C-alpha cells in the first residue's frame, strides 16, 4: 500500500497498487578497548523503494546509510570516573512537495549529524563483593546531547505563496541539551 509523509503525519493511499522492497544490512564491531567498558562502531546500509506507475520512488524511510560510534573510557588512574563519546552520521530522508507525494520531484533532507559526550561518577561499587547489595553499581552522570548544536531536519512544513509557489520550511530536531542521569546496575 503506497504511503507518504506530510510533515510528521503518515498518509496511506488505501489502494494496493504498488510493489516495493526494503533491504539492508548492519555491521557492528563491538569490543572493550578499555576493560569493563562498552565501545562499538556500526555501519548500516539500507534501501527502500516502491514501484508505482512505472517509476521507482524512494520510500519516506529510505535512509541509505548510517555510521555510529560509541566509545567509553575511564579517567587515568581511577575507575570511579567514566567518559563516553557518541558520534552519528546518516543519510537524509527523502521528501516531496504536498499533493505530489509519489512524484519524481522528491529531494533529500541534509545528512543527520550528531555528537554526544557524557561523564559519570560511580557512587556505589559492589561489583567484586561476594554478596553485593541490591545494586551492582550506581552511576551519577551528566551528558551534553547534540554537543555542536547541529540543526538536524525532522520534516518540512510547506508554505504556498499567492502565485502558488511552494517553499519548504524545515522543522528541526532538538538542539543542544544538557541531561543529568542516575544509572542503577543490577
Residue ranges and their predicted role:
Residues 4-94:
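Gram-negative outer-membrane beta-barrel transporters
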Residues 89-98, 121-186:
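C-terminal beta-signal and adjacent terminal beta-strands/loops
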Residues 107-116, 120-122, 186:
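Outer-membrane beta-barrel transmembrane domain signature
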Residues 25-31, 69-73, 117-121, 142-144, ...:
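Residues on the lipid-exposed face of transmembrane beta-strands in outer-membrane beta-barrel proteins
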Residues 14-18, 56-60, 104-108, 131, ...:
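Outer-membrane beta-barrel domain signature
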Residues 19-23, 61-67, 111-115, 136, ...:
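Residues that define the transmembrane beta-barrel architecture of outer-membrane proteins
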Residues 1-5, 46, 50-58, 95-102, ...:
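Outer-membrane beta-barrel translocator domains and adjoining extracellular loop/strand segments
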Residues 1-14, 160-169:
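Surface-exposed loop/turn segments flanking beta-strands in extracellular/periplasmic regions
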Amino acid at each position: 500500500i503506497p504511503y507518504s509523509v506530510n510533515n510528521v503525519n503518515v498518509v496511506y493511499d488505501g489502494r494496493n497498487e504498488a510493489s516495493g522492497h526494503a533491504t539492508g544490512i548492519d555491521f557492528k564491531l563491538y569490543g572493550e578497548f578499555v576493560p569493563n567498558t562498552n565501545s562499538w562502531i556500526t555501519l548500516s546500509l539500507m534501501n527502500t523503494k516502491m514501484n508505482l506507475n512505472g517509476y521507482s520512488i524512494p520510500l519516506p524511510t529510505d535512509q541509505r546509510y548510517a555510521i555510529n560510534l560509541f566509545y567509553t573510557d575511564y579517567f587515568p588512574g581511577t575507575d570511579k570516573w567514566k567518559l563516553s563519546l557518541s558520534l552519528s552520521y546518516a543519510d537524509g530522508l527523502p521528501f516531496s512537495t504536498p499533493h505530489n507525494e509519489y512524484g519524481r520531484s522528491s529531494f533529500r533532507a541534509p545528512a543527520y549529524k550528531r555528537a554526544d559526550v557524557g561523564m559519570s561518577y560511580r557512587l556505589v561499587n559492589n561489583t567484586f563483593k561476594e554478596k553485593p547489595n541490591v545494586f551492582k553499581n550506581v552511576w551519577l552522570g551528566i551528558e551534553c546531547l547534540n554537543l555542536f548544536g547541529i540543526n538536524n531536519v525532522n520534516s518540512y512544513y510547506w508554505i504556498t505563496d499567492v502565485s502558488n509557489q511552494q517553499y519548504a520550511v524545515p522543522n528541526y530536531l532538538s538542539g543542544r541539551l544538557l541531561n543529568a542521569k542516575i544509572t542503577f546496575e543490577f
